[in-house]
From Swiss-Prot:
This is Photosystem II assembly lipoprotein Ycf48. InterPro entries: PSII_CF48-like_dom (IPR028203), WD40/YVTN_repeat-like_dom_sf (IPR015943), Ycf48/Hcf136 (IPR016705). A lipid is attached at residue 19 (S-diacylglycerol cysteine). The lineage of its organism: Bacteria, Bacillati, Cyanobacteriota, Cyanophyceae, Gloeobacterales. The gene is ycf48. Its main location: membrane. A lipid is attached at residue 19 (N-palmitoyl cysteine). It comes from Gloeobacter violaceus (strain ATCC 29082 / PCC 7421).
Length: 323
């Protein structure tokens, strides 16, 4: 089915999900053409500066923008095999791309050229998330639950975490250098802080398995569980609210992110679902994006910009400042 089956269902959803949030303008997002085939999914996005940015995805997809995300151009990359690029990160002109199978690319010139970095085959797993942390420094989270780090541009790597977190499905690095990850089956989530002798494991508090989790630049955080359920924290994960279903259309949520200053949180998922809360998840409103039927996979607010990435090359851009 489409995102919502008409205005009546949309209004019903708003009533059921709770009222009281500020009215949602129907044009808060716009569709940006990417020219991608129906088989390519967009999975992550990052910017070099205010104008220049990169988006990555399946089928070795690499897109570049030079106008702040208003238009995108595909950039061919020569690889020995097709790759699924899962993550991209920049610190100035220094950037990294990570993905499957065991794929890692590096640039030192804002993406004008990319170099393939070979990882030791003895390292278990493939890059799930990459974090550019300086001219030659980066950290990479492997889907086996290990975090590795380089300080010389990828020539050498050291294992940062004392042990593996086990297979993981999502990972988030916060400002103090600690990591939060979700186990592959979603039965638990784990935290590691620099200096900790091991990962700290937390069992889920909901009967529903965890899909993903993330944090704002402050102490606010979100957790998505199966079936469109969400939980929230205001103290960087020390405590979480009880699970609460925020969508009632039978579709799952897959990702979320806070706007600047944590004033709103947007969540996205299956069937083009895109919802927003301005009161810490108590009430939600739905954004209708005509023609979007596939899953929306990633929500990213970067400075004053916002983007949603999805299946079949879908790319949405937030209208106006992400306040």
């Amino acid at each position: 089915m489409g995102k919502w089956s008409g205005l009546g269902l949309g209004l019903l959803l708003l009533v059921l999900a709770g009222c009281g949030a500020p009215p949602l303008e129907r044009d808060e997002w716009k569709v940006i053409p990417t020219g991608l085939s129906d088989k390519a999914d967009l999975l992550d996005i990052a910017f070099v500066d205010d104008k220049n940015g990169w988006a990555v995805g399946s089928r070795s997809t690499l897109l570049r923008t030079a106008d702040g995300g208003e238009s995108w151009t595909a950039v061919p990359v020569k690889l020995d095999s097709d790759s699924r690029f899962l993550s991209v990160s920049f610190d100035g002109k220094n950037g990294w791309i990570g993905g499957e199978p065991k794929r890692l690319l590096r640039t030192v010139n804002g993406g004008a050229s990319w170099t393939s970095i070979t990882l030791d085959q003895r390292l278990p797993g493939s890059p799930l998330k990459v974090y550019a942390l300086g001219a030659d420094t980066a950290e990479v989270v492997l889907n086996s639950g290990l975090v590795i780090k380089t300080v010389n541009g990828g020539k050498n790597w050291q294992v940062v975490t004392p042990a593996s977190a086990g297979g993981i499905r999502s990972a988030e690095r916060v400002a103090d250098g600690s990591y939060w990850v979700v186990s592959t089956r979603g039965g638990s989530y784990l935290q590691w802080k620099p200096g900790d002798p091991q990962w700290t494991n937390y069992e889920r508090t909901s009967s529903r398995r965890i899909q993903a989790m993330g944090f704002s630049s402050g102490k606010a955080g979100w957790m998505i569980n199966q079936g469109g359920e969400m939980q929230f924290t205001a103290n960087q994960g020390e405590t979480w609210t009880p699970g609460r279903s925020v969508i009632l259309n039978g579709l799952s949520l897959l990702d979320a992110d806070y706007t600047a200053a944590d004033k709103k949180i947007w969540a996205a998922g299956g069937g083009g679902t895109l919802i927003v809360s301005a009161d810490d998840g108590q009430n939600w409103k739905a954004e209708e994006v005509p023609g979007i039927k596939g899953s929306l996979l990633n929500v990213e607010f970067i400075g004053n910009k916002g983007f949603v990435l999805g299946q079949n090359g879908v790319l949405l851009k937030y209208r106006g400042a992400a306040d």
